[in-house]
Amino acid sequence: GYDFEMVYYNADGREGSMCGNGGRCIVRFAHDIGIDRSRFTFLATDGEHLADVKDGLVSLKMIDVNYINTSDNYSVLNTGSPHYVKQVDNLANLDVFNAGREIRYSDAFKEEGINVNFVEVMSDGSLKVRTYERGVEDETFACGTGATAAALVFYKNEEGFNTVDIEVLGGKLNVSYNRNANGTYNDIWLKGPAVKVYEGEYHIQDKHIISKA
């Protein structure tokens, strides 16, 4: 069985696809309210996920990725949510909102939408990533499935174990995974901090619910 199920809603109020950082945060929430596990197992819209909490960092196992569609200057893949990944040279000065919005609402993607990630590859092999997210319809501080997508596209080792450090607006993440000879990816783990921002309580339909985040 599962320790819990995660249902994720986008800022537009609609139920969304997998949220990697949301998954890490819900594991931290479960840990903080006393669900004591050496390893968590939970269900999300894209299937089963494993996770653990250690030294203030939450590691989340992502779904396997069986293929990446690559064109001349971008790649498209699904890491639990659909992602468009494009390399750029000067990420800091990029207008992510307008550039991302143009791609998200292009004829190829406007019907179902897509998350758009712009990636700058640093000299040490680490990545800087900025993401325009569908459902939010704006740039966000961090996108876990997007960071994962970028790490898979810009692998270091053609075959075998890879680990990629990623800097996003909200902080730093790490993605580790195994790349197979046939171009598939498995044992994908997204790791980073998850910090409580506030505690509050609210009432819904006369039911008293405590919310902690």
Q: What function would you assign to each model-found segment?
A:
Residues 1-18, 23-142, 149-213:
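Active-site proximal loop and beta-alpha junction motif in alpha/beta enzyme cores
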